Every structure is written in structure tokens, then in C-alpha cells.
């Protein structure tokens, strides 16, 4: 990958790349990121704020709403929508510092959004991947995934929505007592997640997205520049088409997302 001499050149690169990959018809952009390779290509002093702005501003300036995971995995105690940090990466923490950000209420799997339709993530249901979750709300909403420096084969959380919708027997619904606060006011508890079973000694039910990601490429829905193995990829793929492919894949092989075979019961 070429070196970026300034943040403006980085901004220009992403603006041009998003357009070439076909972002124009989409209203929502759900982003997965790993900036290690891109950060190493900046010749200017690395400043987190400028770096993240250069990557996201081209989307905001094009009237897109950007959605980014801000998972905190707060399984007990208190989750504050405004104060609890994310345990993910640079972009994930950056978005929480933006003045216009909206963040969802789920204490384990929250999402943050900026842009004209950022309200989509607010006041969601208590299921992390099921009814009235972010993943359900994005269906039919002209949404695309954009992977920046993160290979698709590493996995996407949409697969858990598919598992829950299709009734994967290797996961179960777990309710958490974490108390959720918004602007210092208690808004509720009893949020749920569809988590891995731990009662089968011969299987850990860890996921493997390699086969499923190949299906996405084979279906021709992934537009991409850069090289995933070098973490320099920018990959854009349609949300609804991705979900349709994953649902069909699961119904054909209920262990498609697992690291080893398992017979549903």
C-alpha cells in the first residue's frame, strides 16, 4: 500500500474508494475495522482523531449514517450508555467521543451511530440479536457492510442474528442482570444474548466463518480493493444479500458457522 503524506490524502483515498466500491445507494454503513496496516502508512504524526475522521468523514459528508460496534461485555453491575467504554478498537472508541453520537442500550453488545439516521440504534429491544435488535432493524434499510483492514473471513456478528432466527441448538438465551443507565437515569435490566452452550465437553462451539465468507465472494456481492491478508482491504457488501446467503447456508448446513461438525438436536 502507498504511503499517505497527509490526512487529506487519506481522506481523498477513502472518498474515492467508497465511491468506486458502490456506496452511493446505501443509507447505512455498518463498519468493521482493524487499522494496523493503514496506521503504518501515515507519514504524518499519528493522531487518532484526525485519522478516524479522515476515514469516516467521506461517508458522513455523503449523507450516510455510520454504525459501529461498541461492545463492552458488561455482564454484571452497571452499564452507562454515555460512560461505559468499549473493549474494541480505535474506531469503536472514537465514535463514542463524537458529540452527535447515539448509542444503543444493550450492556453487552451495544452499537453507536453518527449521521442523519443515527436514531435507528436508540431504544432497541432487549435481545442482542433477535427481536427489535440493531440487526433486525437494519433489514430492508439500504445498509451495507464495510470492512476496513479486517478480512471478512474473521467473521461478522450478523451470523448470530441468523443463528437465533434459524434456531441454532448450540446456543441458548441468557438473561443478564446488568443495570442500564441513560443520562444517569435507570432504564432497565434483563437484557439477553444468544450465547454458546458450555455443556457439551466434546465441542466448544467456537465459530469459523471461512466457508461462509467464501460463499459471499462466490455470490459476487463483495466489492473490494486492497489485500485482506495484508489488512489493507476495503470491502463493501450488501447487508440484506449477505443475510439471505447466510440464512440459506445455515438451513443447508446448521454447523456452517462452527469450527467443527455438530448435529443439531
Model segments located where?
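N-terminal and secondary-structure boundary signal
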Residues: 1-265
Amino acid at each position: 500500500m502507498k504511503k499517505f503524506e497527509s490526512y487529506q490524502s487519506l481522506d481523498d483515498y477513502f472518498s474515492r474508494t467508497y465511491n468506486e466500491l458502490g456506496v452511493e445507494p446505501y443509507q447505512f454503513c455498518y463498519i468493521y475495522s482493524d487499522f494496523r496496516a493503514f496506521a503504518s502508512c501515515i507519514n504524518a504524526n499519528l493522531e487518532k482523531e484526525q485519522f478516524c475522521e479522515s476515514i469516516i468523514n467521506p461517508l458522513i459528508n455523503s449523507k450516510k449514517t455510520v454504525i459501529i460496534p461498541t461492545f463492552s461485555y458488561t455482564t454484571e453491575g452497571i452499564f452507562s450508555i454515555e460512560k461505559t467504554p468499549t473493549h474494541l478498537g480505535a474506531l469503536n472508541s472514537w465514535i463514542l467521543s463524537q458529540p452527535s453520537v447515539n448509542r444503543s442500550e444493550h450492556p453487552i453488545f451495544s452499537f453507536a451511530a453518527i449521521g442523519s439516521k443515527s436514531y435507528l440504534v436508540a431504544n432497541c429491544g432487549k435481545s442482542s440479536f433477535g427481536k427489535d435488535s440493531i440487526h433486525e432493524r437494519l433489514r430492508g434499510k439500504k445498509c451495507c457492510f464495510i470492512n476496513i483492514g479486517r478480512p471478512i473471513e474473521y467473521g461478522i456478528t450478523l451470523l448470530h442474528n441468523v443463528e437465533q432466527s434459524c434456531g441454532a441448538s448450540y446456543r441458548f438465551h441468557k438473561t443478564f442482570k446488568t443495570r442500564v443507565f441513560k443520562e444517569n437515569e435507570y432504564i432497565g435490566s434483563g437484557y439477553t444474548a444468544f450465547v454458546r452452550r458450555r455443556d457439551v465437553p466434546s465441542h466448544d462451539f467456537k465459530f469459523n466463518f471461512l466457508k461462509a465468507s467464501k460463499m459471499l465472494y462466490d455470490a459476487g456481492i463483495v466489492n473490494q480493493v486492497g489485500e485482506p491478508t495484508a489488512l489493507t482491504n476495503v470491502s463493501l457488501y450488501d447487508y440484506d444479500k449477505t443475510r439471505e446467503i447466510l440464512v440459506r447456508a445455515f438451513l443447508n448446513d446448521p454447523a456452517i458457522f462452527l469450527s467443527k461438525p455438530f448435529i443439531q438436536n
